[in-house]
Amino acid sequence: MSEMTPREIVHELDAHIIGQKKAKRSVAVALRNRWRRMQLDADFRQEVTPKNILMIGPTGVGKTEIARRLAKLANAPFIKVEATKFTEVGYVGKEVEQIIRDLTDIAIKLTREQQMGKCRQRAEEHAEERILDALLPKPKNDWDDSDSNSNTRQIFRKKLRESQLDDKEIDIDVAQPQIGIEIMSPPGMEEMTNQLQSLFKNMGQAPAKRRKMKIKEAFKLLIEEEAAKLVNQEDLKEQAIELVEQNGIVFLDEIDKICKRGETSGPDVSREGVQRDLLPLVEGCTVTTKHGMVKTDHILFIASGAFQMSKPSDLIPELQGRLPIRVELDALTADDFKRILTEPHASLTEQYIALMATEGVIIEFTESGIESIAKAAWQVNERTENIGARRLHTVMEKLMEDISYEASDKSGSSFVIDADYVSAHLDNLVQDEDLSRFIL
């Protein structure tokens, strides 16, 4: 789990996301509270439940980007899902409990990597011995000179560690990768499907196969194989489930798309039905997975939505009550667009400069040019559909279209993107109401 303070988390998010201080502070505090809770006594810890968050803001202002960056900072099981992908229990489609099953799979992978990292040194030693056995087979006769053989082994061990034998080929027994069998499961029978897949998986274990490969490649494969042998699978599952239950984070995107709109007749299986199914998950229930039973009482849920066609109050009251922290994200201004073009790590302007440099073309964005690009994107957003920062991608692509097309023929050339260049390439499209609609 991440031990970063809220200030450090916000600082990391600032490197990639412009503005939205309230949202950053809320997710930073929520992430820190996960760490704080784990410092409490076990009995008291069970009484502290996470305060789930609802992020509200127009499209393209950074809701999903906050989730992506948070996943890298969390160092805990984290899953981002779209609420629109699920249907009510009993109908064709994915059930919401699949979220917890997928989160548990992520925790298994995370825990396995951590455990394999801890026993990597032992795995390297075992892999080294197996390679030396392939290079110097053990003598079949008991009267062979063991001292001489041991000295030779040490000489080869030294060469192996100094990478002098990397390109030498050897024959070695390597475990065969298991062939996965995908079974389509009917709704409500996912657990039975998982058991069948496990059965086929165990039946299909192939014996090790002798392969000829270079020592460098063989060493990597053998380290992974030996590390996997050293990991206790039962302990792995227990630790992963504990990790999910105590530190798991679920990011529910597009939650506004499952709000009920107007009066409709008949069952609403992909909207209000999904909300009802989400209630026990958010409140706390037990979900059956192929790795064991997972309790969701202390999993943190962060929901987000644009709410352009609906309002947060359109969510069913029970779900509203389970998302107590509300954060409103601000619409982006022309100044925000200017900062987005220059301040974040690997900003759009830096990306185009780097891409064109591969062709030997030098691109320079002036201050006036960046201001003009930001203003053009903001104007198109105001006149047509406001899609936030995503507008910058299409405006920049249109602006750089000619240079990108001719770059391979103009190696050594330089281009200055100033206000005049931007005006010449974008003014007609921005000013023409009909054409500006085609700049998606």
Curated annotation (Swiss-Prot):
Keywords: ATP-binding, Chaperone, Cytoplasm, Nucleotide-binding. The keyword Lyase does not apply. InterPro entries: AAA+_ATPase, ATP-dep_Clp_protease_ClpX, ATPase_AAA_core, Clp_ATPase_C, HslU, P-loop_NTPase. Gene3D superfamilies: 1.10.8.60, DNA helicase RuvA subunit, C-terminal domain, P-loop containing nucleotide triphosphate hydrolases. GO terms for molecular function: ATP binding; ATP hydrolysis activity; peptidase activity; proteasome-activating activity. ATP binds at residues 18, 60-65, 253, 318, 390. One of its GO terms (biological process) is proteolysis involved in protein catabolic process. It is found in: Cytoplasm. The keyword Electron transport does not apply. SUPFAM superfamilies: P-loop containing nucleoside triphosphate hydrolases (SSF52540). GO terms for cellular component: HslUV protease complex. SMART domains: AAA (SM00382), ClpB_D2-small (SM01086). Its main location: cytoplasm. ATPase subunit of a proteasome-like degradation complex; this subunit has chaperone activity. The binding of ATP and its subsequent hydrolysis by HslU are essential for unfolding of protein substrates subsequently hydrolyzed by HslV. HslU recognizes the N-terminal part of its protein substrates and unfolds these before they are guided to HslV for hydrolysis. A double ring-shaped homohexamer of HslV is capped on each side by a ring-shaped HslU homohexamer. The assembly of the HslU/HslV complex is dependent on binding of ATP. Belongs to the ClpX chaperone family. HslU subfamily. This is ATP-dependent protease ATPase subunit HslU.
